[in-house]
Amino acid sequence: MRVLVTGGSGYIGSHTCVQLLQNGHDVIILDNLCNSKRSVLPVIERLGGKHPTFVEGDIRNEALMTEILHDHAIDTVIHFAGLKAVGESVQKPLEYYDNNVNGTLRLISAMRAANVKNFIFSSSATVYGDQPKIPYVESFPTGTPQSPYGKSKLMVEQILTDLQKAQPDWSIALLRYFNPVGAHPSGDMGEDPQGIPNNLMPYIAQVAVGRRDSLAIFGNDYPTEDGTGVRDYIHVMDLADGHVVAMEKLANKPGVHIYNLGAGVGNSVLDVVNAFSKACGKPVNYHFAPRREGDLPAYWADASKADRELNWRVTRTLDEMAQDTWHWQSRHPQGYPD
């Protein structure tokens, strides 16, 4: 298939592009490089074993989107492009709604003009809000996300659901993922956050490699086994595989298809720190800090629907997530070259 991957040079997008190329698909990457670097592109090609086409541009440029969809005879779109820092979204709500909601509107309007009807959306477990029951199941009603980031994901899900009702021949997958971590096992591709990392694993990795002094663990008084927050961590390679499987199985299958992509188990912040200490062979310096507003004590996925319907399940452990992250970070202490 000929696949347009928006945000394809970012963390999850780049790993997914490698898996798509390895599966023989033709990949066109669209990215404005606001959160990624051009130097990842040759790595994608080398690991994928095939050349991807790259277009530098913005999903909010509807004319450019229409041109790409037409000129490359795109069959399906996997949509990763968007801003993703929860804390930043509270400070910059308009930028998040413009990029994530308006950007997606421009993209699907271009798809309609180009008669492309297969769409995979990179959604998030944040759309569930605060649920009374764990694990989270796709049949749960969506909640009220705490941040503009989460709200933007939920708004896009609602827009896509309305679109599919009005245009019943569209196939739309809403992939709700939990906490992606890890890196390509080669050690040559991984998460390379710009500035201070917003997520746990890259922050731990930067402490271990000497770029940061200490990890702040927000809250050690939660009603969990060790008092720290519990989340569902999924290896980015398992997540990438989930996108490829969803794309291949759901192409031209009309409907809105909703799947949780998670490991189906919860691990605490201290579990992750301990796994990383084991991977890098030394203790990771950390300290406790007050809880962050809006953080939930614990949640994880019920991913049995994806197992049942897509024959997809995670195969990589927390130890492998830590080992692969350390392999990447220790080989590339400063991330990708500028």
UniProtKB/Swiss-Prot annotation:
> Mutating residue 153 to A leads to what result?
Decreases the catalytic activity. Not reduced by sugars in the presence or absence of UMP. It contains very little NADH
Q: How is its activity regulated?
A: Inhibited by UDP-phenol and NaBH3CN.
Which residues are substrate-binding? 124, 149, 179, 199-200, 216-218, 231, 292-295, 299
Assigned GO CC terms: cytoplasm; cytosol
What does it catalyze? UDP-alpha-D-glucose = UDP-alpha-D-galactose
Q: Does the keyword NAD apply?
A: yes
UniProt EC number: 5.1.3.2
Q: In which pathway does it act?
A: Carbohydrate metabolism; galactose metabolism
Active site positions, chain numbering: 149
The residues the record assigns to binding NAD(+) are: 11-12, 31-36, 58-59, 80-84, 99, 124, 149, 153, 178
**Which cofactor is recorded for it?**
NAD(+)
Q: Does the keyword NAD apply?
A: yes
Quote the annotated effect of residue 124 to A: No major structural changes. Catalytic efficiency is very low and affinity binding is 21% of the wild-type enzyme
User: Which signals induce this protein?
Assistant: By D-galactose and D-fucose.
GO MF annotations, alphabetized:
identical protein binding; NAD+ binding; racemase and epimerase activity, acting on carbohydrates and derivatives; UDP-glucose 4-epimerase activity
GO biological process entries: carbohydrate metabolic process; colanic acid biosynthetic process; galactose catabolic process via UDP-galactose, Leloir pathway; galactose metabolic process; monosaccharide metabolic process
Keywords assigned: Carbohydrate metabolism, Galactose metabolism, Isomerase, NAD
> Quick one: effect of changing residue 299 to C?
Loss of epimerase activity with UDP-Gal by almost 5-fold, but it results in a gain of epimerase activity with uridine diphosphate N-acetylglucosamine (UDP-GlcNAc) by 230-fold with minimal changes in its three-dimensional structure
Q: Name one Pfam family in it.
A: Epimerase
* First-tier enzyme category under EC: isomerase
Q: Which family does it belong to?
A: Belongs to the NAD(P)-dependent epimerase/dehydratase family.
Spell out the subunit comment: Homodimer.
Q: Which NCBIfam families match?
A: galE, PRK10675.1
Q: What is the protein's known function? A: Involved in the metabolism of galactose. Catalyzes the conversion of UDP-galactose (UDP-Gal) to UDP-glucose (UDP-Glc) through a mechanism involving the transient reduction of NAD. It is only active on UDP-galactose and UDP-glucose.
Name of the protein in its database record? UDP-glucose 4-epimerase
